[in-house]
């Protein structure tokens, strides 16, 4: 019994080291030419007190040289409204830093949000990266929209609940923007995403599950996503993601977004052993012990941008 306990302890100790973000070979590993701006998804935030949406990611990037800014846009609204808010924030970052461009990284609904800015103001954007982005819509949004008629009483009840959640998140994170969850829902349906993509096609694959153009009007496009809804028995979101993944009917997904829908520009990977929240190192770092740490993925991407002169 003692031998087994010793063996188990040694194994867990070794696994803990495998899970740690890989240290940089030298200072400056993440030091991009242009500032990095992180953009949250639906019902997201920048930080609530000491708790960050991008759990441990911004600090890890800053540690080796990156200038990182975390945007706060409306938790629940259309891609275009969130995009205009982000554009205003980008201009503030450029004014504060003296930089000519930024590197945008958006998660979930943040993916289309950063794409909006890259599309309408390409001169201000060096790169746009979508992480688990709803670039071609999400089945859950389609199911909700198909089950709840626009303008109906059930829609008003559901919208009030979701708007209330958004307002609470906004209050706790210092944002007073108006929440319009019906607009957010419309943006994340397949039809809504298709309409947005027609107006802002940059980087969007022309095939169902291919890659998009790597560079358009001077902006480089990237994407990655997970494809494992359940990754850590201690994560309280694993069970809900496992249930929601049934809506994909066998298609690879992260619990909320299909792998093919996440594609934009150069696809780094669409099959990480991560669920939708693992992609931002949530909840509180409870991610897959047997997959690359999400923080490491962001550090590697910052280094990729650095090596490209971005």
Spans of features found by a protein language model:
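Serine-dependent carboxylesterase/thioesterase catalytic core
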Residues: 40, 68, 84-194, 254
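C-terminal catalytic-base region of ester-bond hydrolases, centering on the histidine
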Residues: 206-310
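C-terminal segment of classical bacterial N-terminal signal peptides
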Residues: 15-23
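Solvent-exposed loop/turn segments at secondary-structure junctions
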Residues: 41-45, 74-78, 108-112, 133-137, ...
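Bacterial N-terminal signal peptides that target proteins for export
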Residues: 1-9
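Active-site nucleophile elbow and catalytic-triad environment of alpha/beta-hydrolase enzymes
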Residues: 192-212
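Active-site catalytic motif of lipid deacylating hydrolases and related acyltransferases
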Residues: 28-102, 150, 158
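Short aromatic-enriched loop/helix-cap "lid" or pocket-rim segments at secondary-structure transitions
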Residues: 50, 139-144, 232-238
